[in-house]
């Protein structure tokens, strides 16, 4: 909670008065469902139509259409840029951010919707899979989704709309620069997407942020007595899809390499404590945990300027999983339902 508040304050510091989002009176490029005022629908139409100028962008909007998603603005999600909730079939965006940011947010979040349709996503979860398998899944999904946002923003730049690319490149150079370099050298989009995917792993602070969510989950669930191990190749084969085939041009086993599954000292310590408690309950140890390499995120020798700290925190917020926003919404909905049920029960008992 303290960390989230820190990022929220940092974003507020670096944000000027938000500019009004562009509006479009043109018909939607694809007939997705919109929710909101007439003005909000025109703003959403602009964002979606811009997305559809990119082939990759249109692909994920088609996924949203096929899965009956509703697009809307959500002003209650703090510094979160947006989220796609597969349970509620909603793609929500924060209207306080520029359209360029929201375009790459949609690309990232709806790429997750495509990933949710894979067998490996259904099979591999914290309840039944070992630590290494869960790390490979989460990281493959996030690296692929970020590489997808990179692809969409690049395609829009090529169509004469550079704002999304300029914003993405400034915020995520470790993803954008390898993409740009590989495309320039090879002319192969698959090579570029692979380079962007691998670039995701160069930000160790982001790795630690996602790992914290996994540790929190493992600390509160009752996982199976024996945890399954999955081959690295499956994560690439199923998550890195492009038209029925994997776009990934490197050895698929790399997702299980030290570079891709390393954890921070704190993460390994926390997981070891969790699995020590499991052992005391008679559950089998997870051999994959002991083999995980430990690599600490670098520490700045000199404190960064306040403006740099604020930007770094805001970018980190952009990379945060939107699960917290989704869970908060569901908790509010559950609480409201419980109040209604209690009121009805009280009425019937009179």
Where does each model-flagged region fall?
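Auxiliary, metal-adjacent structural segments of Zn-dependent hydrolase domains
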Residues: 22-89, 98-99, 288-302
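Extracytoplasmic/secreted proteins, especially bacterial periplasmic and envelope-associated proteins
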Residues: 43-46, 56, 101, 105, ...
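Short pre-active-site segment immediately N-terminal to the catalytic Zn-binding motif
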Residues: 91-106
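Post-HEXXH active-site segment of zinc metalloproteases
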Residues: 100, 116-143
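Active-site recognition of the HExxH zinc-binding catalytic motif
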Residues: 104-117
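Metalloprotease/metallohydrolase-associated module, dominated by Zn2+-dependent proteases
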Residues: 132-210
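Pan-zinc metallopeptidase signature
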Residues: 180-311, 315-322, 326, 334, ...
């Amino acid at each position: 909670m303290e960390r989230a508040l820190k990022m929220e304050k940092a974003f507020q510091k670096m944000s000027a008065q938000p500019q009004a989002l562009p509006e479009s009176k043109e018909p939607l490029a694809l007939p997705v469902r919109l929710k909101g005022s007439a003005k909000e629908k025109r703003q959403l139409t602009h964002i979606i139509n811009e997305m559809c100028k990119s082939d990759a962008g249109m692909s994920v909007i088609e996924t949203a259409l096929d899965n009956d998603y509703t697009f809307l603005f959500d002003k209650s999600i703090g510094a979160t840029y947006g989220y796609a909730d597969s349970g509620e079939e909603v793609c929500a965006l924060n209207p306080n951010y520029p359209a360029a940011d929201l375009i790459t947010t949609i690309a990232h979040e709806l790429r997750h919707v495509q990933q949710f349709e894979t067998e490996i996503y259904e099979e591999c979860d914290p309840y039944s899979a070992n630590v290494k398998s869960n790390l490979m899944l989460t990281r493959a999904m996030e690296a692929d989704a970020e590489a997808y946002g990179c692809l969409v923003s690049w395609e829009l730049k090529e169509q004469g709309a550079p704002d999304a690319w300029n914003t993405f490149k400034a915020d995520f150079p470790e993803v954008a620069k390898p993409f740009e370099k590989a495309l320039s050298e090879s002319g192969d989009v698959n090579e570029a997407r692979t380079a962007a995917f691998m670039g995701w792993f160069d930000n160790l602070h982001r790795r630690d942020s996602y790992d914290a969510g996994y540790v929190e989950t493992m600390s509160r669930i009752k996982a199976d007595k024996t945890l399954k191990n999955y081959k690295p190749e499956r994560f690439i084969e199923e998550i890195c899809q492009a038209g029925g085939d994997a776009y990934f041009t490197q050895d698929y086993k790399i997702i299980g390499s030290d570079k891709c599954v390393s954890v921070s000292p704190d993460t390994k310590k926390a997981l070891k404590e969790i699995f020590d408690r499991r052992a005391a309950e008679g559950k089998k140890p997870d051999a994959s945990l002991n083999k995980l390499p430990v690599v600490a995120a670098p520490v700045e020798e000199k404190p960064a300027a306040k403006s740099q700290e604020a930007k770094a925190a805001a970018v980190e917020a952009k990379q945060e999983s939107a699960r917290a926003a989704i869970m908060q919404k569901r908790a509010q909905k559950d609480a409201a339902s419980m109040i209604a049920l209690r009121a009805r029960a009280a009425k019937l008992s009179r």
